[in-house]
Amino acid sequence: MVTSVRTQPPVIMPGMQTEIKTQATNLAANLSAVRESATTTLSGEIKGPQLEDFPALIKQASLDALFKCGKDAEALKEVFTNSNNVAGKKAIMEFAGLFRSALNATSDSPEAKTLLMKVGAEYTAQIIKDGLKEKSAFGPWLPETKKAEAKLENLEKQLLDIIKNNTGGELSKLSTNLVMQEVMPYIASCIEHNFGCTLDPLTRSNLTHLVDKAAAKAVEALDMCHQKLTQEQGTSVGREARHLEMQTLIPLLLRNVFAQIPADKLPDPKIPEPAAGPVPDGGKKAEPTGINININIDSSNHSVDNSKHINNSRSHVDNSQRHIDNSNHDNSRKTIDNSRTFIDNSQRNGESHHSTNSSNVSHSHSRVDSTTHQTETAHSASTGAIDHGIAGKIDVTAHATAEAVTNASSESKDGKVVTSEKGTTGETTSFDEVDGVTSKSIIGKPVQATVHGVDDNKQQSQTAEIVNVKPLASQLAGVENVKTDTLQSDTTVITGNKAGTTDNDNSQTDKTGPFSGLKFKQNSFLSTVPSVTNMHSMHFDARETFLGVIRKALEPDTSTPFPVRRAFDGLRAEILPNDTIKSAALKAQCSDIDKHPELKAKMETLKEVITHHPQKEKLAEIALQFAREAGLTRLKGETDYVLSNVLDGLIGDGSWRAGPAYESYLNKPGVDRVITTVDGLHMQR
């Protein structure tokens, strides 16, 4: 009998819904606060350095800088404040924002600053003359204001020309300077004000990590759209001003760092003094309205019973059974609890009898470490006895770890047979480790085996180091493809002739200058190379993505001495930062590289390392692919010192500077009829 279940009516708490709604739409509330404060920025005073006040402060400072160029700044403020022409006021604020950024960009050039002040004086004179009335030349186009609008367009063109002449044609320097010189310092001042502390220089340099990554990617996508629009349609005061205004919203993208700080770590709040006079209600404080509920989900008490069979559709976790047949050494049903990994060794049959007409290679079970990193060793490999450890580590002796029986007439082309010989060594060695959490492969001590050369019934013994991890990766039936790829790419395979290791280029350590002993991970950068379809997309940033590939390719191998690795990591992080804001700032700094000799020396050092990279040819092919499919070399040359040095290191002859020869995709006939969208390429019909 099924009893009826009645849903309990929701409990309504006064003020709770409002509180939750306010917290859920905090960003929207901040944006609306910015709009409200922007309308009263001339008459009211902003109190306290709050994050949401920054856009209004920038607008106020821009208007003040422009109005100072006029004969009567107070009259200009009055005209602007009392005007009801919304479009006209917006046009003036856009001009003022670009004008103030131009003043900062031309601070080193007295001549450019004089020209700017002249343009500002003429513009403010037009404001006084126009009056910002209903029919204004600053608003929508009207036939009767055609002459005045022509003068304004001429002044806007002069402003853009002055900026281009003093930034090398790169208007993006304005937004970069705004972020590094004003946005980030303002964020630091807000933190210092709210927490009553002083930030050290290292903390200030890491403030960019406070910005939410997803929100930062949205800003980067908008920045790329702005660059493409500028390339296609040219520059305009409105477009550049709106781009600068977008940068002022960065403080609103901060994580809610204040709410995550424990209450006992916050400074004592300032309690206002009570007003003079009688206190109502006998001096009792009024209870606050509304209810604040903090919900904390504690998952520490959750227990997982691995003794039951759990089917996650992609993994099998069964720790209750370990079937081991000691009679024929069959490891076909070893199930290791590795949270998401099921290892099937059914293909590994280490029977004691082998056919002479077939080749059978048997390896001991790999050591698999889970998050506990607890291990146990095997007592006897010959009988197949296994101790049930928490992490499932299995150690075997050297004579049982690698066994290969090969028919010389059918399998061995060079006349060599690899066999295991008892008594070669009695030392216990572990083959390899697979960390189920990080998908990282660690090579244990190599096994010493004996290689017998078969030549006219003469045997010649050689000692070879054999570590074969590729069969292991191919037999991980339940391991995800990503983990398998990582295992095969990051593992160093050691053979008798040292092929396929970082030692295959012995001259590498001799040609890296001060970084003696520097070695790189092999093929680790291949995972960062995007697909051709992605390269053709609208929002693809060819420069940053390519430099990211180079940064990954220059990742030192763990065999590099620690002092050398630490020093090179510092150089790599400085020249190839994993931060778009820092990368743009470095690009702007390198535009006048002669004023920074230390930076130039570091660039030359990194270029020398790239020149002698063991996989330089592969990286050069990737560079040409970026140039061909994504137009990388359109960002080339003297305007981008960092990118040009990297390309010169990879392509020594400098042929990439020719440009169109490599940009075949962008120069195909009819490419102007191709529309590039997020989902691919489409032909115009």
Curated annotation (Swiss-Prot):
Residues 291-304, 417-429 have a biased composition (Low complexity). Residues 265-386, 404-432, 494-514 are annotated as: Disordered. Residues 497-669 are annotated as: Actin-binding and polymerization. Keywords: Actin-binding, Secreted, Virulence. Its main location: secreted. Transmembrane segments: none annotated. One of its GO terms (cellular component) is extracellular region. It holds the Pfam family SipA. GO terms for molecular function: actin binding. InterPro entries: SipA_actin-bd_C_sf, SipA_C, SipA_chaperone-bd, SipA_N. Residues 315-337 have a biased composition (Basic and acidic residues). Actin-binding protein that interferes with host cell actin cytoskeleton. It stimulates actin polymerization and counteracts F-actin destabilizing proteins. Potentiates SipC activity; both are required for an efficient bacterial internalization. Belongs to the SipA/IpaA family. This is Cell invasion protein SipA.
